[in-house]
């Protein structure tokens, strides 16, 4: 599809474009092509593949938006809420399963759990809860089994203990993506709830990206908490 996102626009600039763009403008063309993509490509994909699903995992990278702004986090939140509208949630009886499939187990997962130390995982999961529940969205999932967790499907770092000035603290060791160097660093604290918008005017988060480590032949792929995800989704079916 021949369209592309308009990045780095503020909310006011976006609204101005929607109000003032002429029918033959680039903005109007992009909007038309995007709507065609939604109605004819995405909708058809959902109808053909997702209508029979009864278990769902929703993944979200809560760390990367923190490196940018509250608006970046809000954009991801809005995208998720739009996604929810395409699925049916609720308890299922036998007839429902046959004629009207619904999601009856739903897990919300914060990714990149290996990019922070283990003591920060509760805060990362808390951000995931805020992402989903803010604005009362949790009401839609009141009748189904839900859970929140944080994982790394491929673990890229190792947690180590560093002694400095007579004090010990947890740190991460891994290959940093930006320079491909092996580093040992403290990644920083994850807020339990999203700071207000003016927080980013004075300071910012800097969560580094890490490369998956090279595996020896026959070595298992390291992960964080993938076993818990499989147990939640499939445990009652085994």
What is the predicted function of each stretch?
Residues 1-102, 117, 135-136, 152-156, ...:
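Switch- and interface-adjacent substructures of P-loop NTPase systems
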Residues 134-136, 144-147, 154, 174-175:
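Conserved P-loop NTPase catalytic core
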Residues 54, 102-105, 143-146:
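Short glycine-/polar-rich loops that comprise or flank the Walker A/P-loop
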Residues 78-81, 126-133, 160-190:
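Acidic, Ser/Thr-rich peripheral helices and adjacent loops at domain boundaries
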């Amino acid at each position: 599809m021949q369209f592309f996102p308009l990045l780095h626009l503020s909310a006011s600039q976006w609204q101005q474009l929607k109000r003032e763009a002429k029918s033959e403008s680039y903005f109007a063309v992009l909007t038309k092509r995007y709507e065609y993509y939604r109605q004819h490509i995405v909708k058809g994909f959902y109808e053909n593949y997702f209508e029979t699903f009864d278990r769902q995992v929703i993944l979200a990278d809560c760390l990367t938006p923190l490196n940018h702004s509250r608006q970046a986090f809000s954009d991801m939140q809005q995208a998720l809420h739009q996604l929810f509208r395409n699925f049916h949630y609720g308890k299922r009886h036998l007839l429902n399963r046959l004629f009207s499939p619904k999601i009856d187990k739903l897990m919300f997962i914060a990714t990149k759990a290996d990019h922070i130390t283990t003591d920060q995982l509760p805060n990362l999961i808390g951000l995931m809860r805020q992402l989903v529940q803010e604005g009362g969205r949790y009401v839609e999932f009141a009748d189904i089994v839900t859970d929140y967790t944080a994982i790394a499907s491929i673990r890229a770092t190792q947690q180590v203990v560093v002694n400095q000035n007579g004090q010990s603290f947890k740190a991460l060791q891994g290959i940093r993506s930006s320079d491909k160097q092996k580093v040992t660093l403290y990644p920083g604290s994850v807020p339990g709830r999203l700071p207000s918008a003016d927080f980013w005017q004075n300071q910012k988060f800097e969560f580094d990206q890490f490369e998956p480590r090279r595996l020896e032949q026959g070595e298992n792929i390291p992960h964080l908490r993938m076993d818990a995800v499989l147990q939640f989704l499939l445990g009652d079916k085994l």
